[in-house]
Curated annotation (Swiss-Prot):
Gene Ontology biological-process entries: translation
Keywords, in A-Z order: Ribonucleoprotein, Ribosomal protein
Coiled coil: none
Source organism of this protein record: Gloeobacter violaceus (strain ATCC 29082 / PCC 7421)
Family: Belongs to the bacterial ribosomal protein bS21 family.
Top-level taxon of the source organism: Bacteria
Name of the molecule in the record: Small ribosomal subunit protein bS21A
Gene Ontology molecular function: structural constituent of ribosome
GO cellular component terms given for this protein: ribonucleoprotein complex; ribosome
Pfam families per UniProt: Ribosomal_S21 (PF01165)
């Protein structure tokens, strides 16, 4: 769960911006989108292989 503490002199807009950034870094929305529909084991393997290729490109 992403949490952001708002400082006394901090505006709501900047706190909201920080919250959105922490949610994006945690990957919460991406995970929710993945769980919208059932993903077969083959699709899961394919998605992980593509992510692995992106992370470690061939030289």
């Amino acid at each position: 769960m992403a949490q952001v503490r708002v400082g006394q002199d901090e505006s709501i807009e900047s706190a909201l911006r920080r919250f959105k950034r922490t949610v994006a870094k945690a990957g919460i929305l991406a995970e929710a989108k993945r769980h919208r529909h059932f993903e077969t084991p083959i699709e899961k393997r394919r998605r992980k292989a593509i992510a692995r290729r992106r992370r470690y490109p061939r030289r």
